[in-house]
Amino acid sequence: METITQTARVFYTAQTHTIGGREHGVSRSSDGHLDIKLSTPGTAGEGTNPEQLFAAGWSACFEGALGIVAGKKHVKLPEATAIDAEVDLAADRNGFFLQARLNISIPGLDRVLAQELVDEAQNTCPYSKAIKGNVNVQYNLV
């Protein structure tokens, strides 16, 4: 197993334990805050799936990044700021892959300024940086 060289300060490490994968699986966090059932999309299963979890985590992280970028510009994000994330599980002849869209609403903010915040947040959000060049993404200011 390859080790990770720590070159930066780690702020937080999430730990989960998953059994069963996306078909009838369960996943729990070490702190007990997350305890979920997993199911394959389109089946009668009662659980969530990795795509929904990614969409929730990414949209929350991106909104946090928007707040950081806005703060640096001395701009207050409206309370009604919201993000609708869509993450597709797709396949082609090379296998499975993800593609995604973030639909970002920043009501009441000048559209040019809002777009600047969205553009800068893409380079701030750890999720966006992690998938850049690996996942086809559309960032839509709505």
Predicted regions and their residues:
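Extended beta-strand/beta-hairpin segments
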Residues: 1-56, 63-142
